[in-house]
């Protein structure tokens, strides 16, 4: 009998506490808003980190595949400076960054999309078959028109531009008017990609 009474009192107490906490949370907008903002921020950052990791993995595997098969390609990653003028020249799309899609674009040499560049914004492909201004720099004769246009874009914006040579299969990056050859090792290449995309 005593045990039942104590159990009943405990349940009543917990129920009242639960009701009080719910009422407090709903009545106190500041508390509620803080909780909502906190959880939204945590979820948003987690999703952004996952999107970024997937993008780095996909970009690395795409560049290596194109390199092995010696398929020429230009992939420009937009940073702070808008690339809208070049997006408008090409074909606007809206697609996740997919190695399969990029292979379809660059492997078909008879397609008009083959020679142009792909532009990426916020980890999504937003333009294909875009063309950039050629650099006027005197560069190594081993570099072709893709390298010259990638370098030209990097001189006019803070975009990071990745190039695969159709002749040698070498992977390069153009950034701030400078072009550099990247590693063909998967892990080192991904480290380099992360480094250049994280630079300010």
From Swiss-Prot:
Disruption phenotype: Probably essential, it was not disrupted in a global transposon mutagenesis study. The keyword Amino-acid biosynthesis does not apply. GO terms for cellular component: plasma membrane. One of its GO terms (molecular function) is diadenylate cyclase activity. Its EC number is 2.7.7.85. One of its GO terms (biological process) is cAMP biosynthetic process. Its main location: membrane. PANTHER family: DIADENYLATE CYCLASE. Probably oligomerizes. This is Diadenylate cyclase. It comes from Mycoplasma genitalium (strain ATCC 33530 / DSM 19775 / NCTC 10195 / G37). The gene is dacB.
């Amino acid at each position: 009998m005593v045990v039942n009474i104590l159990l009943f009192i405990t349940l009543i107490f917990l129920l009242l506490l639960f009701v009080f906490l719910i009422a407090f949370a709903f009545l106190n907008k500041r508390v509620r808003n803080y909780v909502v903002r906190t959880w939204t921020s945590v979820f948003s950052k987690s999703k952004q980190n996952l999107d970024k990791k997937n993008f780095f993995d996909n970009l690395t595997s795409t560049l290596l595949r194109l390199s092995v098969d010696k398929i020429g390609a230009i992939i420009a990653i937009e940073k702070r400076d808008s690339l809208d003028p070049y997006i408008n020249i090409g074909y606007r799309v809206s697609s996740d960054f997919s190695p399969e899609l990029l292979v379809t674009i660059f492997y078909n040499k008879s397609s008009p999309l083959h020679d142009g560049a792909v532009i990426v914004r916020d980890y999504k492909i937003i333009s294909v078959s875009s063309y950039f201004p050629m650099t006027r720099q005197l560069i190594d004769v081993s570099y072709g028109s893709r390298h010259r246009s990638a370098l030209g874009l990097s001189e006019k914006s803070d975009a990071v531009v990745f190039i695969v040579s159709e002749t040698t299969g070498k992977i390069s990056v153009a950034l701030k008017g400078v072009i550099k050859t990247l590693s063909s090792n998967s892990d080192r290449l991904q480290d380099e990609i992360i480094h250049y995309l994280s630079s300010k």
